[in-house]
UniProtKB/Swiss-Prot annotation:
GO terms for molecular function: ATP binding; thymidine kinase activity; zinc ion binding. ATP binds at G15, S16, M17, F18, S19, G20, K21, S22, D88, E89, V90, Q91. This is Thymidine kinase. Its EC number is 2.7.1.21. It comes from Bacillus anthracis. It catalyses: thymidine + ATP = dTMP + ADP + H(+). Zn(2+) binds at C145, C148, C183, C186. Homotetramer. The keyword ATP-binding applies. HAMAP family: Thymidine_kinase. It comes from the Bacteria. It is found in: Cytoplasm. InterPro entries: P-loop_NTPase, Thymidine_kinase, Thymidine_kinase_CS.
């Protein structure tokens, strides 16, 4: 499925927080390195939770990454010997990320992106739905609901231990102090009808 001698393609890894998206991205990048392929990893500058220059999973796995402010800055770091381009926290990139990913895949690169497919309200997040639509491979991961133990497909934002309101700002970078994985039935967003 992931032969490098094929022309370029797009892989999307998505799901809720704590579902293992960054861990899976790191695993795929490490596999390419074992195969002596050249990979480069990018992350948005806004994601500085664990490290400024690494993609770090919640369980501590990490890989070196290039922080970028704008999607098109990715092009400045691509060289001909690259085989694989990986992008973590893709939901935080600007709208140009879809075009950037398309161009890279069309140029023959394997492009792996990872990100949240839904925001804390349970709505499609950023450009991830568009990337899912154009990808050759989509992997949707689930966490475990912190309230009941069921498979969790949503991310619950908590403010002082209570669910955040529907009209709170969409982007709030954080980890377990601000977010929990939840299933459809335990996910709560005050002032929104289900």
């Amino acid at each position: 499925m992931y032969l490098i001698n094929q022309n370029g393609w797009i892989e999307v890894i998505c799901g809720s927080m704590f579902s293992g998206k960054s861990e899976e991205l790191i695993r795929r990048v490490r596999r390419t390195q074992f195969a002596k392929q050249h990979a480069i990893v990018f992350k948005p500058c806004i994601d500085n939770r664990y490290s400024e220059e690494d993609v770090v999973s919640h369980n501590g796995l990490k890989v070196k990454a290039v922080p970028v402010s704008a999607s098109k800055d990715i092009f400045k770091h691509i060289t001909e010997e690259m085989d694989v381009i990986a992008i973590d926290e893709v939901q935080f990139f600007d709208g140009d990320i879809v075009e950037v990913v398309q161009v890279l895949a069309n140029r023959g690169y394997r492009v792996i992106v990872a990100g949240l497919d839904q925001d804390f309200r349970g709505l499609p997040f950023g450009q991830v739905p568009q990337l899912m639509a154009i990808a050759e491979h989509v992997t949707k991961l689930q966490a475990v609901c912190s309230a009941c133990g069921s498979p969790a497909s949503r991310t619950q934002r908590l403010i002082d231990g209570e669910p955040a309101a529907f009209d709170d700002p969409i982007i709030l970078v954080g980890a377990s102090e601000s977010y929990e994985p939840r299933c459809r039935h335990c996910h709560a967003v005050p002032t929104k009808q289900r």
